[in-house]
């Protein structure tokens, strides 16, 4: 037929049977990718250290989504929380991956069947004998079924009534686990960080979808609306479907990047705003202050800080620290975290405690500046030693570690002090293994960054697709030069402009 690549889909334009076939094949490809990707990730995933080497540090993309929905155990005998399991059953990571691959195979066979047997009676209009689809009726059916699925997910799966619940954690991503969630019907249900809103919104949206589906099944659209929105044209369906998809993609790009109850930091990593606002740093200092108020020593107070909380307060886990064309997981960047060295406290020779200014997100390099509790600069690592007034050597800065592997160790050697001051710019200090993965030391983004980038990009492309196909279906008569609703019989070749009696051709 010699169609250009951008017009190949016209082959299913007036062929409902094969239109169905290609959509089933598309579902087969999507499901097959999901199952295969899950098996690949499970093959390379190391579950041994859920605190310092969680799934998001390893660049896992589909495992977090399975975990979010309640899958925590593997046929390999491990659990995502770090424990061991003996009988994970069918609802394990491998079980779900296998189910997707089996479903993909069934869809593949169904697609072939529908491609071969395309001329089914159900697709032909009994009045005209031509292939046709009752699109408003199909819309009602799909809306009803989507409503049932949405309601069922919210009322049964999320609430634990018949299902596992979903992943729920505390605001600092320390105590996450899969648990049943009660619907939040008050104003708190609109807080994007309240898990109960997920249950209540799915129940409400599902109920609305069921009612709307029944409405569209029982009420036919008015003729003027039907014609005005071109409801008989399959390209109208394409245009509105693309609109639904790009809108959803923009929404999830937002909930992923800014964070929400649906994107827990234990599964997808922290957000950049938690670094920008010193979110974990404030919580760490609050806990240390409480410890000191309970008459604990500084060393004891810092030793009670969970390693998991300290690890979140490290710039290498900021998804905005990745870069264009920096492929690979976070572990391929700065390395695999092995242990927390402890919190360094810097002091000058007069005993003042000094704080290292932290590197802002979008800086690759940043001057090492130490300030006191009032924000006055007391020491730095100068660019020009000849003009320096606040160098570590001149001010006599020392460092002592509290908590972690170097608990109680202090250094006064200027070279060592400067080394730890530089590392303090990046948050809490961790020992990182770069040898195992041949990590290059350049920060990478987390799956949170990749997901956001992908969905925001495709949402933009699909937005233009919606405009394109919407314009094509609304203005088809203008583009073609033929009114699709023209009832009068048109004799081609009689007029210079088709159907325009004022342009009758002269008889030769």
From Swiss-Prot:
It is found in: Plastid, Chloroplast thylakoid membrane. The chain crosses the membrane at residues 21-36, 101-115, 140-156, 203-218, 237-252, 457-472. The keyword tRNA processing does not apply. GO terms for molecular function: chlorophyll binding; electron transporter, transferring electrons within the cyclic electron transport pathway of photosynthesis activity. GO terms for cellular component: chloroplast thylakoid membrane; photosystem II. Binds multiple chlorophylls. PSII binds additional chlorophylls, carotenoids and specific lipids. It comes from the Eukaryota. It holds the Pfam family PSII. It is a multi-pass membrane protein. The keyword Heme does not apply. Coiled coil: none annotated. Keywords: Chlorophyll, Chloroplast, Chromophore, Membrane, Photosynthesis, Photosystem II, Plastid, Thylakoid, Transmembrane, Transmembrane helix. InterPro entries: PS_antenna-like, PS_II_antenna-like_sf, PSII_PsbB. GO terms for biological process: photosynthetic electron transport in photosystem II. Belongs to the PsbB/PsbC family. PsbB subfamily. One of the components of the core complex of photosystem II (PSII). It binds chlorophyll and helps catalyze the primary light-induced photochemical processes of PSII. PSII is a light-driven water:plastoquinone oxidoreductase, using light energy to abstract electrons from H(2)O, generating O(2) and a proton gradient subsequently used for ATP formation. PSII is composed of 1 copy each of membrane proteins PsbA, PsbB, PsbC, PsbD, PsbE, PsbF, PsbH, PsbI, PsbJ, PsbK, PsbL, PsbM, PsbT, PsbX, PsbY, PsbZ, Psb30/Ycf12, at least 3 peripheral proteins of the oxygen-evolving complex and a large number of cofactors. It forms dimeric complexes. This is Photosystem II CP47 reaction center protein.
